[in-house]
Amino acid sequence: MAKDLLPKQAANEPSLKDCTCKRCLKLGASKEKKIRRKKKGEEKRERHYGNRRKLTFNFLKHTNMENTNYDVITSVGYLNEKYGLKKSHYIEKFIKCIHRKINIDVSKITDAYVNSLNPWVKVKLFLLLVTLSEKGGPEYWLDKTDGEKNSEASSTDNSLENSTKGADSAGSTALRDEMVKSHKNLFPTLTEQIIQHNINQDFTESTYDEDYVFSSIWANFMEGLINHYLEKVIVPYSEMKVCQQLYKPMMKIISLYNEYNELMVKSEKNGFLPSLQDSENVQGDKGEKESKDDAVSQERLERAQKLLWQAREDIPKTISKELTLLSEMYSTLSADEQDYELDEFVCCAEEYIELEYLPALVDVLFANCGTNNFWKIMLVLEPFFYYIEDVGGDDDEDEDNVDNSEGDEESLLSRNVEGDDNVVERHFKPDPRVITLEKICEVAARQKWI
């Protein structure tokens, strides 16, 4: 009944597409524009997310944060109120960067892989977390001194009781101590294995105290998180900023070089700038042509051709110098911009990371200890524990190899100056100017400046 009461469109009434009045044309055009905009947005989203793997893990959603203050200290309101807008801006970017790292990498690790882990790998990961929870050692050592006093008092009581025993027991004790020491040398503890393999090859518990382990793990882990932020946020932002400054100078150099090439091609096509072979033939027939052509105009033409040949040799050199200067400016500006951004970040966020973020992160990890997500997160965070120090001697050997390779390259080049066929290509070194141009063009394409 309700449908029957609605007014029906007359059969001869024109539709929106058929009507040619201004109102209908305007409505039709706006409708088509909306459809095109919607299709364009869908295509853009497909290009942006089509090849990206869907994340199956979210740190804030899939971890147990009960009895922790992690969600509080990472909230925007808390950060703005305690640290202000400027500092909280850097802190929020850091937290998002770490969450993104964890979410992406944990999503790549399957439960089957976690279940197949060697138990000793899990013991190592848990030991790293326990070591990190000591916060560098000072608080631990404050509690440790009282325990050492009690242990010393108990050891004195035991020594008084044991003093009544015979010489045989004393000899057996000394022998047992020697066996324990030799056993430790043959079979290092788990802590010794971790430190020797990842941080310090010469580490032993007899020469380094626990404070060294706690401080090394704490400093390495914090520095690892900061350096990850440097690589993923500061460096790309600094490169984009520098490329934005150098984009116009680069395009100006390229356009000048293209114009120069076009002029050279036109001059050769018009016959004004003959090739070297043609110019030699012209010189051979000079005596015959001088009698026919005007000598003055011929001299002017030859002078202009010489100037053009000279320009053909000098202009590329000038452009090459400009490209070298552009590359040097890129290197200098990038380094300065990265240092400035890193200093700003450290001044704004280092205190928060050390005093609030890391302790809260440790609490969250302990709250989820034993679950598959816990082992996945620890596998992702493990490289940060060994960020600063490498196993001794690797860097020195690499530097020696670089120096030797550079010396070999110079000797090979000096040997093959005259013989072009014998040039050794395996020592090819990319031109930094080309690398700079590629980097600027890559950033320009990504930012849609081109």
Swiss-Prot record:
Feature: compositional bias, Acidic residues: 395-411
Bias-annotated ranges (Basic and acidic residues): 141-151, 283-298
GO cellular component: cytoplasm; cytosol
Ranges where the record places region Disordered: 141-171, 276-298, 395-416
Compositionally biased region (Polar residues): 152-171
GO biological process: branched-chain amino acid metabolic process; response to xenobiotic stimulus
UniProt miscellaneous comment: Present with 98 molecules/cell in log phase SD medium.
Protein name as catalogued: Uncharacterized protein YKL075C
Origin species: Saccharomyces cerevisiae (strain ATCC 204508 / S288c)
Classification of source organism: Eukaryota, Fungi, Dikarya, Ascomycota, Saccharomycotina
